[in-house]
């Protein structure tokens, strides 16, 4: 694979809590220059980034980040607002505690609700593999597919 082919699959990301708009502009410019798949940012900058990018590179954002330990309605609201502000893709973090408790229906519903909120836009599910057993990783692959998400990360 060439450098360009690899970069075309990369989400250029800045998710630090202290990220500023000038820093977001820098990664937007880098994403444009390098033809990345998207620029992935916190939801508070989605509207500005969409305007700044002017359709050149899709804007992606994260919901329930970084912990995933928030209620489903809040994640869905955050996702819906991001889409209304122009996000083309949403990455969500699962509720790892619910997975560890084997509350599979709750985890599935969490993903389903966010997918419903984003509609036909892309939903990627962050499962934090470093925190999961092999069995939990396998279970999450099934749950993510059943819930209708587009990607698992």
What are these regions (language model features)?
Residues 1-34, 38, 44-153:
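Alpha/beta enzyme core
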């Amino acid at each position: 694979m060439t450098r360009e082919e690899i970069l075309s699959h990369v989400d250029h990301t800045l998710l630090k809590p202290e990220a500023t708009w000038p820093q977001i502009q820098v990664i937007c410019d880098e994403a444009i220059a390098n033809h990345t798949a998207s620029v992935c940012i916190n939801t508070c900058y989605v509207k500005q980034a969409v305007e700044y990018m002017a359709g050149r590179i899709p804007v992606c954002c994260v919901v329930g980040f970084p912990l995933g330990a928030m209620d489903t309605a809040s994640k869905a609201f955050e996702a819906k607002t991001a889409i209304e502000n122009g996000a083309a893709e949403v990455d969500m973090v699962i509720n790892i505690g619910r997975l560890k408790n084997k509350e599979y229906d709750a985890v599935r519903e969490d993903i389903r609700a966010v997918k419903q909120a984003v509609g036909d836009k892309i939903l990627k599910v962050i499962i934090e593999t470093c925190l999961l057993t092999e069995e939990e990783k396998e279970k999450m692959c099934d749950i993510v597919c059943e819930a209708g998400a587009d990607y698992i990360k």
